[in-house]
Regions:
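Bacterial N-terminal signal peptides
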Residues: 8-16
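Intrinsically disordered, low-complexity segments enriched in polar/charged small residues
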Residues: 7-8, 150
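Positively charged n-region of N-terminal signal peptides that target proteins for export
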Residues: 1-4
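N-terminal secretory-pathway/extracellular module detecting exported/lumenal segments
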Residues: 21-85, 94-160
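Residue-level detector of buried hydrophobic side-chain packing
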Residues: 88-90
Length: 160
């Protein structure tokens, strides 16, 4: 019984570590991937619409999660264009009025053809600069709208 349990535990650890290749063509052709921000710094941000979900909502916070692709376009100055596949969690504290926060739960890196370059996880929570309208803010606004039916700006207007 112990041996079976340890084999199951090992399988649970090893299987998620395998990275499934994804190319730029696959991202563009998938109807669930919505381009949110294009052209700035030769980077396009796609959100996998099918991955958007509410994580937590109560009297204190809104939390939503989604898979985001950050794709460096071929016209960038780099010789090796890349793709980041990122699982992100956006959080808004209603009571604290601390703005939008972002936690990166996992990152998988690929070259343009879809060959895996590496994987990372659990990047700490960071504040998103709402005033600058940075890409993380625009992406987060879209994710909140899809998850809750309202954008981040409207959430902040209606807080108590």
């Amino acid at each position: 019984m112990k041996k079976l349990f340890s084999m199951l535990l090992l399988a649970c650890i090893v299987i998620p570590l395998q990275i499934q290749a994804i190319s730029m063509e696959a991202i563009k052709n998938d109807k669930n991937n919505i381009p949110i921000l294009t052209g700035k710094n030769a980077i396009t941000y796609f959100v996998d619409k099918s991955s958007i979900k509410r994580i937590e909502e109560n009297q204190f916070i809104y939390k939503a999660q989604a898979v985001v692709y950050e794709v460096e376009n071929n016209n960038s100055r780099r010789t090796n264009s890349y793709i980041h596949k990122v699982l992100v969690t956006y959080r808004y504290d209603k009571q604290a009025s601390s703005g939008m926060k972002l936690t990166i739960n996992s990152v998988e890196d690929f070259n343009y053809k879809g060959v895996a370059l590496g994987a990372f996880s659990n990047i700490p929570e960071q504040y998103v600069d709402v005033t600058l309208r940075d890409p993380k803010y625009v992406v987060g606004n879209y994710i909140f709208k899809e998850a809750y039916g309202t954008t981040f700006e409207n959430m902040t207007l209606h807080k108590k």
